[in-house]
């Protein structure tokens, strides 16, 4: 539709795209369809003016995952689009993935016209109702005049407090309807009418108690989760840890929140965490939880998790406080704010500090590190997944890493050393198929950075169609497939807990030739089968311009250890036998 310059008569679709641009959205991910065509038609004009760019994925689930990773990589809100019916339902897994990991995304769905809602019209589903349990908030646009307010509220709600997913459902005729559009000259001057007002900041009394508990502790540990990453609190965490020499362990979501080359770093804790991190948590006298939620994959047997410790729990979401573990001190706040105030208070009273208060504790942890290091098996005739991932980590130290879910994800968490905001992985929901579209989102967010996708042969086949998106936009992404021809984690559990009854977990028969598959999309593919010259091969791969798929044929029966069996405590780990070749921090 043509508009006169300065005209106020606009369509709902115009208002929607205008508000996205006013909220500084530069890139969106989606897939068109009937009910959302008015929005796509409007988007066409805005793209011509280079005010916004849309990336066409090959499946709507990938649009949500790409928006999710874009949000993680930029600390902004990611946006995805899909049509009504199957387009909208295809977003559901991606929306749930983002919500479980507290990632701010806005999913915009088309809907049948208002007159047809409730009539079982073609491609009508109640996406508002379907997604209610897996979003932070939902909107249905019933009047185009509400679009400005709804979009502003969606951005506010998605980003403020504990971040999360927001759905905006837009009937087709709302996008087409013309009305007298009143935009906002400055979004900053527009205060959303929502009553959602999260409270930030600790009290002076809370900071003083935090300091007192910390200074009285002899065996403290920082237990850092995804909330610290979202808060971008790495500097403050490192300063606090260095100030009193406190060891630090992170969750899967918390990777990158602390310098992983720092000797105070213990790696990940929990089911596949390092032995020394789990031992340290089991023996600590003060557990400081920063943006972590005490989930089952971390705690093991909850009654025995840090059972001798006092707990300080800092989280922006009051619902997480006391949900699984009652703390002695609870602070509902952004982590960065709390740590800044704590550090300021501690620096004022340095004369009362015992500089050696944790020396014996650190010495004990150092012994655990030497006794139970992460192991890397080696055989010149074979290729082990730990070798591949460890070499990638050493060569690509500044890269963004997107992973899928399974054994390779746990090995990546163990061996990759990542920087703040550069770890992209589905942690809460554990969504297979996340890695490839996440790598796309990260590349769009950071076009000049190295993006590496580490996936498994089973996970990769969940969303391999996104090779088409990578080819279309010529995205320089390096895809390492850890190919053991199994659903590796399922096989490991079947071996350990189901008497080796491998029910439907073998993927060998019917597996495509991934190299030829990549070539069919116009993407170069290569295969690596042994550890011979592995370092030089990976160096060449990473330095080669353009997208590249690497099919790593690894030992088929390798298991991921350490491992905590269901119902066991974190001090009861499987697989702590010494290996021929080891690596320590």
UniProtKB/Swiss-Prot annotation:
GO biological process entries: isoleucine biosynthetic process; L-valine biosynthetic process
Cofactor note: Binds 1 Mg(2+) ion per subunit.
An annotated GO cellular component: chloroplast
Positions of region (Thiamine pyrophosphate binding): 407-486
Requisite cofactors: Mg(2+); thiamine diphosphate
Entry's EC annotation: 2.2.1.6
Binding-site residues, thiamine diphosphate: 60
Subunit structure: Dimer of large and small chains.
Name recorded for this polypeptide: Acetolactate synthase large subunit
Native organism: Cyanidium caldarium
Gene: ilvB
